[in-house]
Amino acid sequence: MAKITRRKFLETTAKIGGLALTANVAPTFLRHAWSQEKHAAYLNAQIKWRQVEGEEIKILVTPAHYFNKFRAVSPQFEELTGIKVTFDIIPPREMREKAVLDFGAGTATYATHTGDPMFLSLYEANKWIEPLDDYINDPTLTDKKWFDKDDIIPLWLAADSVNGKLYALPSEGEATIHVFNRELYEKKGLKPPATMEEFKETAKLLNKIDGKAAGAALRGFRGAGQNLYIWPSLFLAWGGKWFGADGKVLVNSEPGVKSLEYYCDLLQNYGPAGVENWNWPEIMEAYAGGNVAQFIDANSTASVIENPAKSKAAGKTGYQRWPKGPSGRRVTSIWNWAMSINSALPKKKKNATWLYIQWLTSRPTQLSSALFLESPDAVVRTGVNRISIWTDPTYRKAINFTPDYADVVLTTMKEDTDPDWRPRVPQWPKIGEVMAVAIQAALVKQKTPKVALDEANAEIEKFMKK
């Protein structure tokens, strides 16, 4: 696996820009030449990188490994631009709350944050964030050919847009895929399922195999980013729609009820005990420990699953796209960490923020940071935002968990995503909480799926009318 240290990171970005580092440089020019060459990938762009030199921006991020990488390589941006970048690091839920408080108060403490795309409609409705077209179309701020926005995964861009306008850029993302233990499949003579019904049948056949492994696991923990990160894929795969053409809420429609019945039946009968309290870390750890035969969740789990020091499933795992639902659709969960510009910032800080977002989401930074080792336990990023990187031989070699892993993820991201997989409306935070409660109530048999969704539908109707 290709791995990059801090020095190697700088060398790699130079090579991406078309210049190899040269050792035979006259001493009087050494510092200048080194500076020029390590920034070559960026100096090739027709951008005035130092136009707001001396500005300082603060960014709110989560403690995830990909943001550790971004923070570790950000000194290169500071040297390139003369812009000081500082970070506050807090967990996702608290981060969203803090960002909303900052937006609402207009204090502009944070220039940008690693946001949830589902909140962009709320931000846009309150004019808390800037549309990015003016920045992208400004030739002093952006070299459109160099930046090549069209290389970014299209449906992540769609998810970061509101009413057709782009309000954020994806810095990191993921797709949900089917992850399964090949050895257990072979033991039972099973083939990877083509449909969700076949998936449930494999869960039944694999359940308690060798006396312990659960047949399958999905997120059961209550939350808009937990159980409601998975069930919407089932809802749409069953042919569901959140709203009718007349705006009527449709979560208690037949596809809603049937997909929730499926989810409950699968986990109640073939899932692990206590799955209603499981989020992705519990699922990943159980699978790695041999206690779950298969699951559907983020492709990023592969970095841990394929680490022999942490996983019994390393080298024994298969990856495939979601099986098709009754409607014939595969619908993956769509996610990216969306970086927007705080509208309350003064103009120079807005420009400084855009320069950072552009730098971070550019191909050179995405590729080099993906391979950068910020600590001895660091793993390669599996959520780069560029199609060209997913097809890059260096990157594909680094994530060669199985011969088809990269193709499975890239195809999923290109073909199985729907930006409206969850409703992108300002009321989303309320919808997310109501639906998460309903789904868990059905899972733990407090209510039938029909009753849970009828009640959720009525509650959502009330606040959607306001």
Describe the role of every protein-language-model region:
Residues 2, 8-32:
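N-terminal export signals
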Residues 44, 48-54, 133-151, 220-221, ...:
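Short, solvent-exposed loop/beta-turn-alpha elements that line the ligand-binding surface or hinge
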Residues 37-51, 117-175, 227-230, 314-320, ...:
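Hinge/lid segment of periplasmic solute-binding proteins
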Residues 202-205, 246-277, 318, 322:
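Glycine-centered hinge/linker elements that transmit conformational signals in sensory
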Residues 51, 137-140, 300-314, 325-434:
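C-terminal lobe and pocket-closing loops
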Residues 157-171, 176, 200-249, 255, ...:
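Extracytoplasmic/periplasmic solute-binding protein
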Residues 75-152, 183-194, 286, 290-294, ...:
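Extracytoplasmic "Venus flytrap"/periplasmic binding protein-like
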Residues 39-43, 50-52, 56, 84, ...:
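Conserved C-terminal helix/tail region of periplasmic/extracytoplasmic solute-binding proteins
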